[in-house]
Curated annotation (Swiss-Prot):
It holds the Pfam family Toxin_12. Coiled coil: none annotated. InterPro entries: Huwentoxin-1. It comes from the Eukaryota. It comes from Chilobrachys guangxiensis (Chinese earth tiger tarantula). This is Kappa-theraphotoxin-Pg2a. The presence of a 'disulfide through disulfide knot' structurally defines this protein as a knottin. The keyword Secreted applies. It is found in: Secreted. GO terms for cellular component: extracellular region. GO terms for molecular function: ion channel inhibitor activity; potassium channel regulator activity; toxin activity.
């Protein structure tokens, strides 16, 4: 199950489509796509 916006993550693949993991803050955010 993918993480939604601002969900916790460790890598980009933890996040839903169009989201990427922010490594310093450890949450999913819009990746610009």
């Amino acid at each position: 199950e993918c993480r939604k916006m601002f969900g916790g993550c460790s890598v980009d693949s933890d996040c839903c489509a169009h989201l990427g993991c922010k490594p310093t803050l450890k949450y999913c955010a819009w990746d610009g796509t």
